[in-house]
Amino acid sequence: QISEYKPEWLMLQPSSADLLCNYIIEHNIDIPDSVRYIEFSGELLTDRVRRLTKDVFRCSIANQYGTNEVETIAYECPHGAMHIMNSNVYVEIVDDIGRNVSGTGEGNIVVTSKTNKVMPFIRYKIGDKGCLNVHKCDCGNKAPILELTSARPSDFVITKGGDKVSPYIFVSIFNVINNTLDGTIKQFYVEQSDIDKFK
């Protein structure tokens, strides 16, 4: 589909990009040169996946860090630093009992939403670990830099053949169904009861 549609911009989860790039390499698929920019979000982006994606697509790459609850927390600048979106969230690094970690020490990332007036998230622990760096960045952005050190692992659907498939495949399936049902499905839940059975 990428070859047919010829997109200029892709938004991917690192785990999905890893699977996609390896599939492209294994099947010797030609990637159109229309892809000029790839944005990552949703998971911890490792150096390996970044290099792999850049080698396969040969385009600019940026990383966005956020959650469904508070949206964007930090965004990568051209110099590779993840600057906190101060207008959207307040970020703290705390220990396991909620005390602020001093300096650039590692701890649990907690966020407070500055924009959600209906259901505010205050010191929301998102399950990731990191540290704050306040050194001056050459890009000119004065916002603190968030360094993510560990993140929650992503779930995969394991097929009978042992392949790993992103669970977001179900989102695509239900989007197709909803297009024919005029958006009747508002929520869905999928459970893998056996290696080849879903309900």
Over which residues does each language-model region extend?
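Active-site glycine/GP-rich loop and adjacent strand/helix microenvironment
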Residues: Q1-K199
